[in-house]
């Protein structure tokens, strides 16, 4: 996925997001520039910083979805945060550096999963071996009565390995391992030892606790206090899953995982900063605006490049791509502090959705809403079909309600479709084998009264 061209990235985004070509092009170019930067000599590589993007547009038009799909495409660490969750240093709330710690945690989880996948087969074989030893344990050792035998215990053990009984034990275990692998014993019960989940410590440091300082007392004390183990009775299938995870954990080098996670967060990380318009000052210098300005000033050093301390080590934010988004109904991008405006040089405006866009959203994307409902009801044996005129009617109604009430973009389609299919979803278990066709009349019967009554539509749709 490294060397995708901007055109290929836009084509991929087209499968899931309708319209918004300008925004798609902007993120595609930003992504390609990352690839280009990696090909440069080291002295130039450090000089080139990512061009952060500011997306301006109403809710439900695809701002978050573009960033989320992009991160999924390139398998990059991605974190979405709301700017309103953060507070200025000295106020109760989350510290802005928390977004970088979240990014590193996401990156660590991704790298760990990749490493575990690489050792999965080996871990599985070790788990099968361990499970066979639990199910057919070694015979209990005899009590040593003669003190001299204590000095020659090693000789006794070696002698035991050449004992015919030992060969018999190994043969039985190999047979058992074969049955475990073939799944013959999946529902058998077995008792295994598992580590107890650590109970969270009492939080004394307010919101965010000591995590905000990049410390974790449980990790510090982990080496001093051995983990407690408890016995659990589970099926062989479940035991195999637990033991495979334990064995995989032993096979991977966590120091290497942490180093790679930090590097990936620094080089490929994407932070999606939503609701940035809500922290824009509207001209007042008192009340909540004071704190808003403080949050902007706190975000500034992170966006322009600084070092954030995390429990896995220091993380440089110089090459992390920041995508900010906001509706800017009550404020303008120029209401942000000038320094922060300058850190988002690429600005793209996302357009409000038209009736035609709504219709495409219902059918074109790979995860289109109508396809989801067809598949959901197919599990109950109901064959659901949407006619062309029904899709036009749903799109028209979604647009009308958005214009009349609050404009929530494509999310309005979910509300309307739920209302249209409410009775059908309820009765589906008793309709096995039936075909239901949703046409214009069906949609109008369910919704026309609600849509045309502005008071009703405000509460129901």
From Swiss-Prot:
Q: Where in the cell is it found?
A: Cytoplasm
Q: What does this protein do?
A: ATPase subunit of a proteasome-like degradation complex; this subunit has chaperone activity. The binding of ATP and its subsequent hydrolysis by HslU are essential for unfolding of protein substrates subsequently hydrolyzed by HslV. HslU recognizes the N-terminal part of its protein substrates and unfolds these before they are guided to HslV for hydrolysis.
**Keywords noted in UniProt:** ATP-binding, Chaperone, Cytoplasm, Nucleotide-binding, Stress response
One of the Pfam families matching this protein, by short name: AAA_2
Which source organism does the UniProt entry give?
Carboxydothermus hydrogenoformans (strain ATCC BAA-161 / DSM 6008 / Z-2901)
The entry assigns this protein to a family as follows: Belongs to the ClpX chaperone family. HslU subfamily.
| The name this protein goes by in its record | ATP-dependent protease ATPase subunit HslU
Q: How does it assemble?
A: A double ring-shaped homohexamer of HslV is capped on each side by a ring-shaped HslU homohexamer. The assembly of the HslU/HslV complex is dependent on binding of ATP.
Q: Which SUPFAM superfamilies match?
A: P-loop containing nucleoside triphosphate hydrolases
Q: Lineage in the entry? A: Bacteria, Bacillati, Bacillota, Clostridia, Thermoanaerobacterales
Entry's Gene Ontology BP terms: protein unfolding; proteolysis involved in protein catabolic process
Recorded GO CC terms: HslUV protease complex
GO function term, MF aspect, one:
peptidase activity
